[in-house]
Amino acid sequence: MFYHLIAPLKNKTPPLTYFSKERHLKGALVNIPLRNKTLLGVVLEEVSKPSFECLELEKTPYFLLPFQIELAIFIAQYYSANLSSVLSLFAPFKECDLVGLEKIEPTLNALSQTQTNALKELQKHPASLLFGDTGSGKTEIYMHAIAQTLEQKKSALLLVPEIALTPQMQQRLKKVFKENLGLWHSKLSQNQKKQFLEKLYSQEIKLVVGTRSALFLPLKELGLIIVDEEHDFSYKSQQSPMYNARDLCLYLSHKFPIQVILGSATPSLSSYQRFKDKALVRLKGRYTPTQKNIIFEKTERFITPKLLEALKQVIDKNEQAIIFVPTRANFKTLLCPNCYKSVQCPFCSVNMSLHLKTNKLMCHYCHFSSPIPKICNACQSEVLVGKRIGTMQVLKELESLLEGAKIAILDKDHTSTPKKLHNILNDFNAQKTNILIGTQMISKGHDYAKVSLAVVLGIDNIIKSNSYRALEEGVSLLYQIAGRSARQISGQVFIQSTETDLLENFLEDYEDFLQYELQERCELYPPFSRLCLLEFKHKNEEKAQQLSLEASQTLSLCLEKGVTLSNFKAPIEKIASSYRYLILLRSKNPLSLIKSVHAFLKTAPNIPCSVNMDPVDIF
């Protein structure tokens, strides 16, 4: 008999010991009896015979690959997450007959000398940062790196931050890698996922393009991971376990012979700081040089005469425009001009957004909706006005000003299914649409030859927010959106902001901004300090506060040297009827943070809290 430690899946029970007639089962998925049920579990390791009687496990044909087991254990430890819950993220492998596909010889565009030099430099390092201006040809470098990996009979993974990036990226890669390419994201149906995995098992799929969950796929002989748009916050999960896929890739490059390339035109400050002195490859300028004119307007009006004239010229020349708006819906909030009270969600301490299409107010946190009120609840005034314009309101105003213009919206409300997303992007690519209005989705890597005008509205709402990353997020967005214009033809960028003096300093070279921000960023925040955020919530505000106070007292006894603690009410104090209090831990040493949190969780297991290591924001 052989004894094995098993982590039950989708169950918070700690690992348990079972016996088997087989050994060397590490990573195997097995059926185990537990409390009159049969559960699926993962074998973690072989152990000595225990002093108590054990039940027998039943082996299945599925198993996790060694890198998956290693990664799962790291996630559980680093992010203070339940190991069984973490293991449930991973898709297992199954041995099967290999598909005898005809060998694909990729037909690639020749790289320029600059691109060739960049690729050679990237391949000198297990992990590196490709800092390439928009339009500089990063994707061509990616494809050559992937082709070389497949030639070595290894598999490759290309991570993209959002599903909105994948259709266009897929088309470019499909022409080159044909049947070796597979697409993975959360909107796939269960049947589509099953078909995908069967092709992965047979190694028909050797290159996966996917969002962050693709990192948990069983890619055999994984040799290369590319993280495109590495700066994007979408790589950070906001649900437990709150992992950052980009950072996990860097961990894999450290533990396994897997090359990792991070790519961005606007790299995150943390990545720039990490790589700037050792493995940063700078790719300046455009692959196809074009002229771009940047125009600032100091105004709080949205559709100004100057902007309207520019849009008319775009339509007259049969070209295209994109317009960035940070808010979906018609307006971010409904305000009473008499008493200055806004309409708030009854379950969250946030304003409700105005959606005229459905004639409702909606909370974008808990999704509560209600009819649009006719009077102010606070002072009974019959006048309510919308504030902070959204995508739908921009569409409404432009349709009245640009008769006959074909305008579409790219935001969460309009891309609820993959088909809707594809239709919007394909119509714009086929020039069936003149103007595309969108939220941050519009900034993410789209490449359209006929876009000659990029418009940035409402950027002040981002750069003036309370986040310590506010300026970084705002300037990065400016660069990304400006990069959608004049990729193959000359064009213009309209930026409406009252902070033109500040922003004008950084529009020549994003590296100028990174160096400025490194000097300005307080020592209390990343990349100079590491953060861990603990959240305590309860339907009763006093109990939520009491939980955080009890936790603070316990934590103060558990803190490692160099770790500081602050306790405060969350900036958004209520979400979905639960009041929220936060504890923020800081340290220059991440290991000290992890040890402090582990000690607290062990000392106070009955104090419920969520742990967010390396939070991208504090809200």
Swiss-Prot record:
Cross-referenced SUPFAM superfamilies: P-loop containing nucleoside triphosphate hydrolases (SSF52540)
E.C. numbers: 5.6.2.4
Swiss-Prot/TrEMBL cofactor(s): Zn(2+)
Motif DEAH box: positions: 228-231
Residues annotated to bind Zn(2+) 1: 336, 339, 376, 379
Chain sites annotated for binding Zn(2+) 2: 345, 348, 363, 366
GO biological process terms on file: DNA recombination; DNA replication initiation; DNA replication, synthesis of primer; double-strand break repair
Pfam family name, one: PriA_C
Enzyme class: isomerase
InterPro entries tied to this protein: DEAD/DEAH_box_helicase_dom, Helicase_ATP-bd, Helicase_C-like, P-loop_NTPase, PriA, PriA_3primeBD_sf, PriA_C, PriA_CRR
Organism superkingdom: Bacteria
Domain Helicase ATP-binding: 119-285
Keywords: ATP-binding, DNA replication, DNA-binding, Helicase, Hydrolase, Isomerase, Metal-binding, Nucleotide-binding, Primosome, Zinc
GO molecular function annotation: 3'-5' DNA helicase activity; ATP binding; ATP hydrolysis activity; DNA binding; zinc ion binding
Cofactor remark: Binds 2 zinc ions per subunit.
Oligomer status and interactors: Component of the replication restart primosome.
Similarity comment: family membership: Belongs to the helicase family. PriA subfamily.
HAMAP family: PriA (MF_00983)
Function: Initiates the restart of stalled replication forks, which reloads the replicative helicase on sites other than the origin of replication. Recognizes and binds to abandoned replication forks and remodels them to uncover a helicase loading site. Promotes assembly of the primosome at these replication forks.
Name of the molecule in the record: Replication restart protein PriA
Organism, as annotated: Helicobacter pylori (strain J99 / ATCC 700824) (Campylobacter pylori J99)
